[in-house]
Design a protein with these regions (language model features):
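Flavin-dependent oxidoreductase catalytic cores
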Residues: 1-186
Length: 186
C-alpha cells in the first residue's frame, strides 16, 4: 500500500460506473488518465483527447471527486500540441475541483514520445503560488540521475513509466541512487 487504480474515459456515466467498480477493490487512490496519447483512446475523446476540451476535463474530475471518498489524482500532458500548452491553468482547475495530486508528462499529445520531455512547464506548475497539491513529473525519467534532477527541481516525485518496461528493478536502482548517490552494483 498505497494502491492506486487508474481509469480513463470521456463519458460521465461510464467514468462514474468505473469509479463504483474500482471502489469495490478497496484501493487507496483513484487516478484519472488524461494523458494517454494512443490514437485508439484519443479518438474517443479520452486520455490526452480530453486536452481538447478542458471544461469536460474539469467537470469529469469534479464529478469523480464528488462520487468517491477516495483521493482522486490526475495524470495528464502539457497540452494537445505546442499551441495549446495550458498546463498551469489545467493544474489550477483540477486542484480547484478537488484533485489531490497531479502527474504531468512533459510532452504534448502531438509529440507522443518524440523529442525530449520538457520539465520546465512542470516546474512552473509546482512554483505557481496557487498550487497546494503535490506535482509529479513524468516523461524521460530513464536514469537514476534524471530522477535526482526531478528531486532537485523541487517536484514532489516522479512517475516512472516506459523506463521500467522490461526493467522492473529500475525502481530499486532509482531509490538506491536517491539515497546514496551511487549506482547499484550489477
Amino acid at each position: 500500500r498505497p494502491v492506486g487504480i487508474q481509469i480513463f474515459g470521456a463519458n460521465l456515466d461510464s467514468m462514474l460506473k468505473a469509479v463504483d467498480i474500482v471502489e469495490k477493490t478497496n484501493p487507496d487512490i483513484i487516478d484519472i488518465n488524461f494523458g494517454c496519447p494512443v490514437k485508439k483512446v484519443v479518438s474517443k475523446g479520452a486520455g490526452a483527447g480530453i486536452l481538447k476540451d478542458l471544461d469536460l476535463m474539469e467537470s469529469l474530475t469534479k464529478a469523480i471527486v464528488k462520487r468517491t471518498k477516495l483521493p482522486v489524482t490526475v495524470k495528464t500532458r502539457l497540452g494537445w500540441d505546442e499551441n495549446t500548452i495550458k498546463i498551469v491553468e489545467v493544474a489550477e482547475r483540477l486542484q480547484d475541483v478537488g484533485c489531490k495530486a497531479i502527474s504531468i508528462h512533459g510532452r504534448t499529445r502531438a509529440q507522443m514520445y518524440k523529442g525530449e520531455a520538457d520539465w520546465t512547464y512542470i516546474e512552473k506548475v509546482k512554483n505557481n503560488p496557487r498550487m497546494e497539491i503535490p506535482v509529479f513529473a513524468n516523461g524521460d525519467i530513464n536514469t537514476p540521475e534524471r530522477a535526482l534532477k526531478i528531486k532537485n527541481l523541487g517536484l514532489d516525485g516522479a512517475m516512472i513509466g516506459r523506463a521500467s518496461i522490461g526493467n522492473p528493478w529500475f525502481f530499486n536502482e532509482v531509490k538506491h541512487f536517491l539515497k546514496t548517490k551511487t549506482h547499484l552494483k550489477p
